[in-house]
Amino acid sequence: MPELIACLSTGKGTWGHVARLLSDNTWDKIYLITNDYGKENFTVNPKTELLSVNMSQGLKELRDEIHEKLKDKIKDTEVAVNLVSGTGKEHMALMSALLKLGVGIRLIAVTKDGVEVI
């Protein structure tokens, strides 16, 4: 399986979705874009790295921070992405950072049938 990159931020019940996503599939590596609260309070497995960013900064600054934190980590030409948790601004910043890195994107989610590409 490829690397997974997901937002871990706001939204009622979204942490449960992200946790299920991590446990339902075997990923090579998992990067969760979160804030300090998420880094301190979300339980992860050994393949997961929590990348804490300042979610309150402007869109371009957030994009640049995410880009900086991911640029030396992604090893493949394609990544799986989940955007269930977080805000539109966080999603735009993550997508822009990934496109700036030049990687392909597969949107994935947990459905009633398990983890699927959507």
Region spans (language model):
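Long, low-complexity, Lys/Arg-enriched
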Residues: M1-A80, K89-I118
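Conserved TIR/SEFIR loop-to-helix hotspot centered on a Trp-containing motif
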Residues: G86
